[in-house]
């Protein structure tokens, strides 16, 4: 364009030329003149750049909170925590888990070196305290969680013992004095444990009933167990869950239902016909959608068959393990309490855990509603429920993943459950509960809406794992307002955008990445933990520019007056 004259090229032609350029070239060309600057900010141009650069499906609309395509492109490019800023090497063995305080001022780490370390999260991260758990007969620490007001830390670990030992313990640590306040047994150790309220936590215990049949008992424990009266409860039984085919309850977590109607990001439901996952509402009155008890004639047929077997009048065509499972199912039919319904408007919570019904590997997610009157240790404990024949508690919902579950995490609003799983082959049949199907190397990241109990979107896939079923371990994931991140066995952490379902960053370590966690107050800060014994801190390019920008020199209060007198 001539100075002050008419453009030499029409806008439409400049637009067509800019369409053939990449994002960086478009921005550079926009510095040439005012006309090119105006075209370089065109909304249609940046919509094309966005879909092409990020390879987003064209039927996915723009993020509902975005004001323009240019700003949305900039958000995904500039606010993802992908710049490594600090490496922490204080652990001497594999780092297994990370957790942030709700304020974001502190975080905790657990490791195979059997310590729980508490860190101060500042511009430069520093170590505040290290608790050595070896004096308590722990083998290693595996999980931690801050309570709601950040005054207490729950730390979960594994006891020393034989390779097949499944016992663990939960410790509660004061964040004011770093004193150990209480310890609670936890079996199996991969129940992990979690907070239900600010001062009460959930632990597990396991009782064997048969060779492949057991009962998981979930307990509510008071974090402060130095009570003054023997009439004050420090523990209360929450639920008793029947386990079939060598399965157990593991990986407990609590979802608060109070924010379901005002989510940070509303995700659309996917097509249930294309998903291998099945969700059963066990508390529904609609018999057509309930994966619940068998019909009465089937129950009677099973009962008569077992009676004839016990009396020696029939020869079972089942293996000993299959026969045990049938007997356990029959026992549960008359000794399981139906799901208890909450009153209208009651503030309930969901207890979420992994379980199964076909094999020992966790392939289902159990969901049990916790009602307000169950959220306290007050009330009778010994002899509770003796007047009833109902021994087991029924679940409210079951999600069948059709694969090995290796990680779960909740969105900040608690409405969406994200699940890391390694799929079984299509049509796989479990003939022996001790020999689950082979699992895929690809990790699928599935998303479920806990309000509608439906799967949403398609599975995210980029990360990989290589260990077989019997060596498979947990890969912890985390969810922020806009992003979801996960570790992987391929020596990388991964970050996806929750709305567009695209992978935005790969974060490199020297070994398996076990855990990732966003700062709850600043999603542009992410921590990753690895088998390479390090914790890495990652910040966004935008944050790095702000932190590294030169600060103006302070001027004296009357400096402007002095300049006027010259």
Swiss-Prot record:
UniProt keyword terms in alphabetical order: Cytoplasm, Phosphoprotein, Repeat, Ubl conjugation, Ubl conjugation pathway, WD repeat
Pfam family of the protein (one): WD40
Short sequence motif D-box: positions: 303-311
GO biological process: proteasome-mediated ubiquitin-dependent protein catabolic process; protein ubiquitination; regulation of centrosome duplication; regulation of mitotic nuclear division; SCF-dependent proteasomal ubiquitin-dependent protein catabolic process
GO molecular function (one): protein kinase binding
Residue ranges of every copy of the F-box domain listed in the record: 3-49
Main localization, broad class: cytoplasm
Modifications made to the protein after synthesis: Phosphorylated at Ser-151 by PLK4 during the G1/S transition, leading to inhibit its ability to ubiquitinate SASS6. Ubiquitinated and degraded by the APC/C complex during mitosis and G1 phase.
Protein name listed in UniProt: F-box/WD repeat-containing protein 5
Natural source organism: Homo sapiens (Human)
């Amino acid at each position: 364009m001539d100075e002050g004259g008419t453009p030499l090229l029409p806008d439409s032609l400049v637009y067509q030329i800019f369409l053939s350029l990449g994002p960086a070239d478009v921005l550079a060309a926009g510095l040439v003149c005012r006309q090119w600057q105006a075209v370089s900010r065109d909304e249609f141009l940046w919509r094309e750049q966005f879909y092409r650069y990020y390879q987003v499906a064209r039927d996915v609309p723009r993020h509902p909170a975005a004001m323009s395509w240019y700003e949305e492109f900039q958000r995904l490019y500039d606010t993802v925590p992908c710049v490594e800023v600090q490496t922490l090497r204080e652990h001497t063995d594999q780092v297994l888990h990370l957790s942030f305080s709700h304020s974001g001022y502190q975080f905790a780490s657990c490791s195979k070196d059997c310590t729980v370390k508490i860190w101060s999260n500042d511009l430069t991260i520093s170590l505040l305290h290290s608790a050595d758990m070896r004096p308590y007969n722990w083998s290693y620490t595996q999980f931690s969680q801050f309570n709601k007001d950040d005054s207490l830390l729950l730390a979960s670990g594994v006891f020393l013992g034989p390779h097949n030992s499944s016992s663990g313990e939960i410790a509660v640590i004061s964040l004011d004095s770093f004193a150990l306040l209480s310890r609670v047994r936890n079996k199996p150790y991969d129940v992990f444990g979690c907070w239900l309220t600010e001062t009460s936590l959930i632990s597990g215990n396991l009782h064997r009933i048969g060779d492949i049949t057991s009962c998981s008992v979930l307990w509510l424990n008071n974090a402060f167990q130095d009570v003054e009266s023997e009439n004050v409860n420090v523990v209360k039984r929450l639920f008793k869950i029947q386990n079939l085919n060598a399965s157990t309850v593991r990986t407990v977590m609590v979802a608060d239902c109070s924010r379901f109607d005002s989510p940070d990001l509303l995700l659309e439901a996917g097509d249930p016909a294309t998903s291998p996952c099945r969700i059963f509402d066990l508390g529904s009155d609609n018999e057509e959608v309930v994966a619940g008890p068998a019909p009465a004639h089937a129950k009677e047929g099973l009962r008569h068959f077992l009676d004839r077997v016990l009396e020696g009048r029939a020869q079972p065509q089942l293996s000993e393990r299959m026969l045990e499972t049938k007997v356990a199912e029959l026992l549960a039919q008359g000794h399981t309490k139906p799901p208890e319904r909450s009153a209208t408007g009651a503030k309930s919570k969901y207890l979420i855990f992994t379980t199964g019904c076909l094999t020992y590997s966790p392939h289902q997610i159990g969901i049990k509603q916790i009602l307000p009157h169950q959220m306290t240790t007050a009330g009778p404990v010994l002899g509770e429920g003796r007047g009833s024949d109902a021994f087991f508690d029924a679940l409210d919902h079951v999600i069948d993943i059709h694969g090995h579950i290796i990680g779960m995490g909740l969105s900040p609003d608690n409405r969406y459950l994200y699940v890391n799983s390694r799929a079984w082959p299509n049509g796989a049949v479990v003939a022996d509960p001790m020999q689950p199907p082979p699992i895929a190397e690809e990790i699928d990241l599935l998303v479920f809406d806990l309000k509608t109990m439906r799967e949403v979107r398609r599975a995210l896939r980029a990360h990989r794992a290589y260990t077989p079923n019997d060596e498979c371990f947990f890969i912890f994931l985390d969810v922020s307002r806009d992003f979801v991140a996960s570790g992987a066995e391929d020596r990388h952490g991964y970050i996806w955008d929750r709305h567009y379902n695209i992978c935005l960053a790969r974060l490199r370590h020297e070994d398996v990445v076990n855990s990732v966690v966003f700062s709850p107050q600043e999603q542009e800060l992410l921590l990753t933990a690895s088998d390479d014994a390090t914790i890495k801190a990652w910040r966004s390019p935008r944050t790095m520019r702000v932190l590294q920008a030169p600060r103006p020199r302070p001027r004296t209060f009357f400096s402007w007056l002095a300049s006027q007198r010259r």
